[in-house]
Amino acid sequence: VEKNSELPDGHKDKKFKGRIVFEGCHVKDEANNWAIFSEIASCPATMHASKAADTYGLFPGHGIMQADARQAYTQCTLKGTETYVRLPYEAWPESWKERKMWDPVCPLRLSLYGHPDSGGYWEQHCESHVLTKGFEKIDEWRSCYYHPELKLFMIIYVDDFKLAGPNENLQMGWDLLQE
């Protein structure tokens, strides 16, 4: 996808963006049988939780801010069954091309969009980071957290974050999360 296509050619903000995904419909095991994955359940925040955050953000002196995690899934390593992938020729390192390799595979180390377990690993990684920053889980709602000192309520829906609370604390909350 071309971003900022309205800008003149050569402009620093005009660029093409894409995403490499794990195409789960072509996964086979070492015996060439279709692979079966054990589902690692992820549970993003609900619509009710989002509305509760909106309500909290509407209190006097409060606000709401949203942000996306950058390249969320690739922030965490893939665990479990060792997985190998074929890279498109355009992504091959020069050494593979020079050796005239045929159909090489390499281990998949980072979670990728499309892998059945990526969502669960991202959620585990994200929650562990959030908890180290002083946020506490809200037991009744998965992917919902409260920071008692800053009085911030945060929900996470996959890689989208919504933070609500006192206006003067919102930026401090984001700064904590980005450490």
Q: What kind of region is each of these model predictions?
A:
Residues 1-179:
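Nucleic-acid-interacting cores, centered on viral/eukaryotic replication and modification enzymes
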